[in-house]
């Protein structure tokens, strides 16, 4: 399935929210007025200098941006090839990239006069970021989280509760991220008058994929500036993990029209691509889920299959529609890493860099381990260190039999 090559890879979506054959808005009739209101409010906010100035102020003084671009010297020496930089999104307030997007959406919710915020969460980082900003701005917060994820991400559940959020366990389906998103959408339909749905990734109906991408693009814009200061030129390659894909899109988007920059997205191969996994590009086909058309894990009857990853944040049977399009037009190379490869990369990063990475970016780091040794020493590679791994220590210890 090939989409025509565009003049610019950065111009999408069209006015109906399509990236080539992907995206759009497939939603219940009751939600359509909300979606259109949101689109209008975002279009107005985007060109309002006061909105931008307020957001920049919060990003600097509350989130702690810009996040550093860090030369991973010992990992670079260990692999003996490309010069590796980490974009340290793990150092943001709340410990991941999620807060960049949540800040923008919560500011939009306030602008729209919505006092109640709902969110879905997998690894808990989007839930924590949402609970954090609801506390800061005095808004009611309800977070939907799969029961399986509640068990494996307990530290984040406690953080959300400490911040005043109500955490609602979801027991339907596989009780993970997809199911949490289903429940959040149901709640939104029921409470349209006062509720804003803060989606955590570049998925959902238009304008969410575009809006989340725009709020996360601060990552890539900072990298452009920082790498020019450090190296005097653009990087040769970018690499990031992909579940829905917001951290990756935030890094990739500002570089899409730079043909000299190779771009790699890393999906979760779970137990392997022939077994249980969460690699929608590698093992999926086009379909509709959560309001947009994209690559999905489906059976022969078109039913959504359960995804699996050791990482709760990548455990989703779809991918953002813009990523699906970028795959089809050949601009982004999609790879996948297994649970075991991610665990090995996790341990390596801890021991060589003194950085405990989240299991999500550990998948990207696993592919750095494959790519970097084959590249020349002057090749500049930037990995998005999208979150810190405190939340994963119990899960990692369990998988490693307690032996770090």
Curated annotation (Swiss-Prot):
- N6-(pyridoxal phosphate)lysine: residues bearing it: 98
Q: How does it assemble?
A: Tetramer of two alpha and two beta chains.
| Documented EC number(s) | 4.2.1.20
What InterPro entries does the entry give?
A: Trp_synth_b_CS, Trp_synth_beta, Trp_synth_beta/beta-like, TrpB-like_PALP, TrpB-like_PALP_sf
Could you tell me which Pfam families the record lists for this protein?
Answer: PALP (PF00291)
What are the GO MF terms of this UniProt record? tryptophan synthase activity
Name assigned to this protein: Tryptophan synthase beta chain
Q: Which UniProt keywords apply?
A: Amino-acid biosynthesis, Aromatic amino acid biosynthesis, Lyase, Pyridoxal phosphate, Tryptophan biosynthesis
Q: Which GO terms describe its cellular component?
A: cytoplasm
Q: Which family does it belong to?
A: Belongs to the TrpB family.
Q: Which Gene3D superfamilies match?
A: 3.40.50.1100
Say if the entry is tagged with keyword Zinc-finger: no
Which cofactor(s) does the record list? pyridoxal 5'-phosphate
Keyword Amino-acid biosynthesis annotated: yes
Q: Which reactions are catalysed by this chain?
A: (1S,2R)-1-C-(indol-3-yl)glycerol 3-phosphate + L-serine = D-glyceraldehyde 3-phosphate + L-tryptophan + H2O
Top enzyme category: lyase
Name its pathway: Amino-acid biosynthesis; L-tryptophan biosynthesis; L-tryptophan from chorismate: step 5/5
Summarizing the function annotation, the protein's role is: The beta subunit is responsible for the synthesis of L-tryptophan from indole and L-serine.
